[in-house]
């Protein structure tokens, strides 16, 4: 998975999305699927992800171990994070989402841009492998687009915040 060479390994956020696979009927939800994401705050990008039928500490541990260590990790109040060994400090937010706002926003982007993750959608994934493949492709494009925005804004600091596909030649 592509990660920006400008990644600041200071603060990471972790969260998970719940969804289902295999079938979609009004009385049957199929198999649970969880998308676990780890993001860097600067630049705003997904640095690791995994998909499984349940949230498991060993999968989150593999995500943490798969990239260079961050100084601080932030997660929601899920007790599963207590079983993960973080290299830096870990803050578990039990009462609010003040320290997980970035990962919540990125997870909202995943739901928005990937039809199979939308709520009340007619699309769904029949297999976890398909969901993993779609996420891998999307995350690569998402991270590269975010890098293109960063480069564009660096080169044109007074140009405003608007950025679209017509600006991609700046990368």
Where are these predicted regions, by residue range?
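Residue-level recognition of single "structural anchor" positions
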Residues: 1-171
């Amino acid at each position: 998975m592509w990660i920006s060479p400008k990644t600041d390994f200071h603060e990471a956020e972790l969260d998970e999305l719940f969804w289902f696979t295999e079938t979609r009927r009004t009385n049957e939800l199929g198999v649970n699927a969880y998308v676990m994401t780890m993001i860097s705050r600067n630049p705003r990008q997904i640095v690791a992800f995994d998909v499984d039928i349940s949230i498991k500490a060993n999968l989150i541990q593999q995500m943490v171990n798969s990239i260079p260590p961050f100084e601080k990790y932030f997660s929601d109040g899920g007790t599963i994070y207590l079983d993960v060994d973080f290299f830096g400090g870990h803050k578990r937010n039990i009462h609010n989402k003040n320290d997980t706002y970035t990962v919540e926003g990125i997870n909202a982007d995943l739901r928005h841009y990937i039809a199979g993750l939308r709520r009340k959608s007619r699309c769904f994934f029949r297999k976890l492998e398909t969901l993993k493949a779609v996420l891998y492709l999307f995350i690569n494009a998402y991270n590269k687009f975010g890098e293109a925005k960063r480069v564009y804004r660096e080169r044109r600091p007074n140009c405003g915040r608007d950025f679209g596909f017509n600006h991609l030649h700046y990368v």
